[in-house]
């Protein structure tokens, strides 16, 4: 495994750990999710280019489409929560609270 793959895997791991540790604000969770999607995109693209998988060449584009949809939904949820509650805490998203 080359150093580039190790660095991208470490970026994914750091983003995952950031998602697990900084769960209080919705914006930090969204940024960590975007970091994970970006590292997955780069790793998938490099694997396809290095192994000459011509049939799977559309997979990174599809991943980018899903990442854009996830970002749009996340930002709309952030705007809705900020307008409703005044903060972007994740604990405000609990539907069981009165």
From Swiss-Prot:
Pfam families: Oxidored_q2 (PF00420). Its main location: mitochondrion. The keyword DNA damage does not apply. The keyword Hydrolase does not apply. Keywords: Electron transport, Membrane, Mitochondrion, Mitochondrion inner membrane, NAD, Respiratory chain, Translocase, Transmembrane, Transmembrane helix, Transport, Ubiquinone. Coiled coil: none annotated. Gene3D superfamilies: 1.10.287.3510. It catalyses: a ubiquinone + NADH + 5 H(+)(in) = a ubiquinol + NAD(+) + 4 H(+)(out). GO terms for cellular component: mitochondrial inner membrane; respiratory chain complex I. One of its GO terms (molecular function) is NADH dehydrogenase (ubiquinone) activity. It comes from the Eukaryota. The chain crosses the membrane at residues 1-21, 29-49, 61-81. Its EC number is 7.1.1.2. GO terms for biological process: ATP synthesis coupled electron transport. It is found in: Mitochondrion inner membrane. It is a multi-pass membrane protein. Core subunit of the mitochondrial membrane respiratory chain NADH dehydrogenase (Complex I) which catalyzes electron transfer from NADH through the respiratory chain, using ubiquinone as an electron acceptor. Part of the enzyme membrane arm which is embedded in the lipid bilayer and involved in proton translocation. Core subunit of respiratory chain NADH dehydrogenase (Complex I) which is composed of 45 different subunits. Belongs to the complex I subunit 4L family. This is NADH-ubiquinone oxidoreductase chain 4L. It comes from Lynx canadensis. The gene is MT-ND4L.
């Amino acid at each position: 495994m080359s150093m580039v793959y190790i660095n991208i895997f470490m970026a994914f791991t750091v983003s995952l750990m950031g998602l697990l540790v900084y769960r209080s604000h919705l914006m930090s969770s969204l940024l960590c999710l975007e970091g994970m999607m970006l590292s997955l995109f780069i790793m998938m693209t490099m694997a396809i280019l290095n192994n000459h998988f011509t049939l799977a060449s559309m997979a990174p584009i599809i991943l980018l489409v899903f990442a854009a949809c996830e970002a749009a939904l996340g930002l709309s949820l952030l705007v809705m929560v900020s307008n409703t509650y005044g903060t972007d805490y994740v604990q405000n998203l609990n539907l069981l609270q009165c």
